Amino acid sequence: MTEEKASVRTYDPPEEFASRANVRDPGVYEEAARDYEGFWAERARKLHWFREWDEVLRWDPPEAQWFVGGKINASYNCLDYQVQQGRGDKRAIIWEGDEPGENRTLTYSELKAEVEKFANVLKGLGVRKGDAVSIYLPMIPELPIAMLACARIGAPHSVVFGAFSAQSLRDRINDCEAKVLVTADSGPRGGKRTPLKANADEALEDTPSIEKVVVVRRTGDEVNMVEGRDLWWHELMREAEPECPAEEMDSEDILYILYSSGSTGKPKGIVHTTGGYLTHVNTTTDWVFDLKEDDVYWCTADIGWVTGHSYIVYGPLSNGATALMFEGTPSYPANDRWWDIIERHGVTILYTAPTAIRAFMKQGPGPIEKHDLSSLRLLGSVGEPINPRAWEWYHEHVGGGRCPVVDTWWQTETGGIMISPLPGITRTKPGSATFPLPGIFAGIYDEEGNEIEGPGVGNLVIKRPWPGMLRTLYKDPERFRETYWQKYGDVYFSGDGARRDEDGYFWVTGRVDDVINVSGHRISTAEVESALVAHPAVAEAAVIGRYDEDTGQAIVAYVILEGGREGNDELAQELRQQVRKVIGAHARPQEIIFTPDLPKTRSGKIMRRILRSLSEGRDDLGDTTTLADPGVVESLKEQVAASR
């Protein structure tokens, strides 16, 4: 099916699905618009509060406080409250390891017991309310256990993605001044191992705030244990007291800090607080995924990213759902691993990224056809815009043509889903995230700050505060204002572009700033450039994202070498390794083009738009009148052609 045909076809919710859906009344949009504070207050009451709030929203742009005066605990809502409602013996987490046959299941009662013990471990290590804890773990149950233990005692957690380098870990620990680091000996993924403890040891050479390191024995690999600092998880848990009451947290107390790529290169510590965030992810998990008591829900993200925080841990568990966690990759040890997992565990809801879907398309439906996926009833997409052809393929081959597809738009900053179909109500168009959810007020603005009404293209904004919104950037309120609020005043600027069609559907077009989206991972161009320039052979580098049918975008680096040195394949490989070491494997450039010069304006600014056009093979380079040396473009065209 061509992109054009796919993008004009529409799909109504299947009748049987719609009749049982959690949200069946389209009037919910109007109800939320009429009294959106009342709407969110009603949703918040689905949670357990030790004390109800005095005020739903206090808004002093750009600072929002939700459920002011309310007392709540995220861990209590995800565990104790579920046990009280009779879910103690229900499976909370089904864990599937990297190697087939490695499985673990934790019921709500079992998860609660583990969390209470680890909360006491943290207290015993001197962690108090307000102290940050860094977590650098593979996708194992100890990761959500550590997060929920932090939430239980009021210690903000800062999870660092396991593929990040020692330097990235060090920078994040130092920024949040974590007191304790929780890591593992190593992390298996796709048959390979990441030396997490060795990376942590390197990072800890320069992290003055860290007092203790807790190490999970995941693989049994031999690791260096520093006496007096490093402690084994299993030994601490063996001695831990079994009961730890949940702290009564203010609604606006910090739940976690999660670092995201910024256009300046310095990672941004995005701060999410407790009451508003939990309300947002609890509601969106229930409504967007239409959760039922017997669902087995699988979000394939890593918990190191916000999708895992919101839609593996806090959203599903606060709804009493059964969530599946997978440590491995789609293709190890065979390319039908995911379909085998779905069949064996009876997965009913699958939430994954377009990158994975495009990889499966390349293999064809063969691996899927070996398995019975009839348990699936809903499919979701996250991380980047999904192209219509991938949407159609997902719907037809994975969902058997019967499962609604919810294409979701949101960000680390928004905390939870913002634009998405409601699967029992919304007529979907492949490639469109459809409409802002009830209680979310999205709009499209032009560069001058005028709102575009009706069909049009511009910058995607959110016009009113919402409960899951980031409250600030950790220790950097100025950057918070500058990044999200300076452009349009009281309106949140997302950094994404969008188009609205004649039916009011939103089509997200991707980043408009200097952040690249590779397989749903946001990577700062400035961060990659500074990693490249740190190599002694590199004089200057410019990094752009070009379209890639597998990963959405691919990283391309244009590199000027010192002293007229010639580039070669060996040096290109060395530079990729340099980026891997400084940032992580996910940020390695797919293509490195050596060039004697870069297209710059007379003021010295690199014109990345021209580099992007050249990389994508486009002849129309737009306005080039501001170039200091137009001849550079011709020479670059030759360099690009030679590199292909």
Swiss-Prot record:
Sites where the protein binds Mg(2+): 533, 535, 538
Record organism: Rubrobacter xylanophilus (strain DSM 9941 / JCM 11954 / NBRC 16129 / PRD-1)
Family: Belongs to the ATP-dependent AMP-binding enzyme family.
Statement: the UniProt record of this protein carries the keyword Acetylation: yes
Annotated positions binding ATP: 383-385, 407-412, 496, 511, 522
Protein name, UniProt field: Acetyl-coenzyme A synthetase
Keywords assigned by UniProt, alphabetized: Acetylation, ATP-binding, Ligase, Magnesium, Metal-binding, Nucleotide-binding
UniProt-recorded Gene Ontology molecular function terms: acetate-CoA ligase activity; AMP binding; ATP binding; metal ion binding
Catalytic activity: acetate + ATP + CoA = acetyl-CoA + AMP + diphosphate
GO biological process: acetyl-CoA biosynthetic process from acetate
Residues noted as binding CoA in the record, renumbered to the chain: 189-192, 307, 519, 580
Primary role: Catalyzes the conversion of acetate into acetyl-CoA (AcCoA), an essential intermediate at the junction of anabolic and catabolic pathways. AcsA undergoes a two-step reaction. In the first half reaction, AcsA combines acetate with ATP to form acetyl-adenylate (AcAMP) intermediate. In the second half reaction, it can then transfer the acetyl group from AcAMP to the sulfhydryl group of CoA, forming the product AcCoA.
Residues with N6-acetyllysine modification: 605
HAMAP family (UniProt xref): Ac_CoA_synth
InterPro entries in the record: Ac_CoA_lig (IPR011904), ACAS_N (IPR032387), AMP-bd_C (IPR025110), AMP-bd_C_sf (IPR045851), AMP-binding_CS (IPR020845), AMP-dep_synth/lig_dom (IPR000873), ANL_N_sf (IPR042099)
Changes after translation: Acetylated. Deacetylation by the SIR2-homolog deacetylase activates the enzyme.
Entry annotated with the keyword Repeat: no
GO cellular component: cytosol
EC assignment: 6.2.1.1
Lineage, uppermost ranks: Bacteria, Bacillati, Actinomycetota, Rubrobacteria, Rubrobacterales
SUPFAM superfamilies from the UniProt entry: Acetyl-CoA synthetase-like (SSF56801)
Uppermost EC category: ligase
